[in-house]
């Protein structure tokens, strides 16, 4: 992808019309690629513009449309509650990684879907942070409070600051907001709670993640 961008940006007339680059999450983590783009084009925006769970709300089946148009259900052993939790963890992991490598904006493909995971232009159904019931009311999936927490820590105009994490179970991203407050997001990937010591400006904060 970087090679394609480089080729496009080599055209001066085309490059002057580019404000930034959009990217998705579907083929795995590409955090290093974001950092390379940030280094190459520091004046351009990096915006995550599409991601969503690949199953209907409250359903542990992944939905996919085959080439012949027949809908396939790919069953798994996860319960809806388990897969909702894994969705939320995937969102947090992706956002933390993107923030740490130069992302400046994040957009979900489906902020709201109906109970069938639609409407969609192709077969199947997708999940979302919010689901609209038949009477028009909204209910939150587990993804929503994760997004709330991250958006509350990284407010518009925030500047990412350096951090270091000891160990592999806890992911972190930190920033300074325009009002001078420090925002910190921690994601515990372990199966159990862990104690976290946060050192900042010579002070120590003990928390549980």
Predicted regions and their residues:
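Composition- and surface-driven signal marking solvent-exposed, interaction-prone regions
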Residues: 33-36, 61, 121, 162, ...
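Active-site neighborhood of glycoside hydrolase catalytic domains
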Residues: 1-59
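Active-site proximal loops enriched in glycine and acidic residues that flank catalytic Cys/His/Asp
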Residues: 25, 48-51, 107-111, 186-188, ...
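Loop/turn elements at helix/coil->beta-strand transitions in domains of secreted/extracellular proteins
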Residues: 16-19, 41-46, 101-106, 156, ...
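Aromatic/acidic polysaccharide-binding cleft in carbohydrate-active enzymes
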Residues: 48-146, 161-166
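Generic recognition of flexible, low-complexity loop/linker segments
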Residues: 33-37, 93-97, 170-174, 185
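Sec-exported extracytoplasmic/periplasmic mature domains
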Residues: 10, 100, 149-152
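Carbohydrate-binding surface patches
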Residues: 152, 162-203, 207
């Amino acid at each position: 992808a970087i090679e394609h961008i480089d080729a496009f940006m080599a055209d001066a007339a085309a490059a002057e019309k580019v404000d930034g680059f959009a990217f998705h999450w579907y083929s795995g983590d590409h955090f290093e690629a974001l950092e390379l783009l940030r280094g190459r084009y520091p004046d351009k925006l990096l915006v995550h513009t599409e991601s969503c769970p690949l199953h209907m709300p409250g359903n542990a089946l992944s939905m996919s449309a085959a080439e012949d148009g027949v809908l396939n259900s790919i069953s798994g052993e996860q319960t809806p509650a388990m897969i909702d939790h894994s969705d939320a963890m995937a969102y947090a992991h992706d956002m933390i990684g993107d923030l740490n490598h130069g992302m400046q904006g994040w957009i979900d493909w489906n902020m709201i879907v109906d109970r069938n995971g639609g409407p969609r232009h192709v077969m199947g159904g997708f999940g979302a942070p919010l689901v609209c019931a038949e009477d028009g009311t909204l209910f939150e999936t587990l993804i929503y409070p994760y997004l709330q927490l991250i958006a509350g820590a990284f407010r518009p105009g925030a500047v990412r600051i350096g951090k270091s994490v000891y160990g592999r179970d806890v992911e972190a991203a930190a920033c300074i907001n325009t009002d001078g407050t420090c925002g910190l997001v921690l994601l515990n990937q372990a199966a159990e709670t862990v104690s976290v010591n946060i050192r900042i400006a010579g002070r120590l904060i003990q928390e549980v993640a």
